[in-house]
C-alpha cells in the first residue's frame, strides 16, 4: 500500500485532508469485488442535496482479513487491525477456508513473515488500542484482543 494525503478544497478554499491508501493487485485481491449498497451514506447525501452514491465495490473479506493479519503480525503500529478484525468477524460471515487460502498466498507473496503468524504486542499498543477501542463493541484490553486474534488465526488455519 502506498499512503497519500488528499487535500480537498470546497468553494475554492482548503477544506480538509483525507488519507488514501492505494495498492496494487498483489494476489488477485482486485480481480473481483464484493458490492455493497451504501444505504446510510445515500440517506446522508440526499439530506445534503446530493444524489445517492449507489453501490460501492469493496475488497472481498477474505483478502481484507489476509491483509490485516499480515499488517498486524509485522512490526509497527497496526493495533487498529486488532479492532478491525473483531468487527469484521462479528458483523460478517468470513469464509475461513477462503481466508486461509488468501493468507497463505499473501504471506508467501510478500515474504516478510511466515503463515500462520503469532501476533505479539508492539511498543505503544496499550495506549493506541485503548483509545481506538473505546466505545466500540470489541474487547477493551489489548492483551485480550491479541489472544483473540491469535485464536482467529488458528480458526483460519484449521479451515479447509
Predicted segments — roles?
Residues 1-160:
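Structured mid-to-C-terminal alpha-helical surface segments
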Amino acid at each position: 500500500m502506498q499512503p497519500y494525503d488528499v487535500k480537498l478544497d470546497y468553494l475554492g478554499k482548503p477544506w480538509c485532508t483525507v488519507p488514501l491508501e492505494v495498492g496494487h493487485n498483489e494476489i488477485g485481491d482486485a480481480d473481483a469485488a464484493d458490492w455493497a449498497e451504501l444505504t446510510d451514506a445515500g440517506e446522508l447525501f440526499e439530506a445534503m442535496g446530493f444524489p445517492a452514491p449507489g453501490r460501492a465495490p469493496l475488497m472481498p473479506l477474505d483478502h481484507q482479513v489476509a491483509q490485516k493479519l499480515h499488517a498486524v503480525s509485522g512490526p509497527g503500529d497496526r493495533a487498529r487491525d486488532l479492532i478491525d478484525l473483531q468487527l469484521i468477524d462479528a458483523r460478517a460471515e468470513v469464509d475461513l477456508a477462503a481466508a486461509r487460502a488468501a493468507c497463505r498466498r499473501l504471506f508467501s507473496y510478500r515474504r516478510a513473515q511466515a503463515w500462520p503468524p503469532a501476533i505479539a504486542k508492539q511498543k505503544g499498543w496499550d495506549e493506541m488500542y485503548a483509545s481506538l477501542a473505546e466505545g466500540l463493541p470489541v474487547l477493551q484490553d489489548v492483551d485480550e484482543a491479541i489472544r483473540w486474534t491469535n485464536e482467529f488465526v488458528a480458526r483460519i488455519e484449521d479451515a479447509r
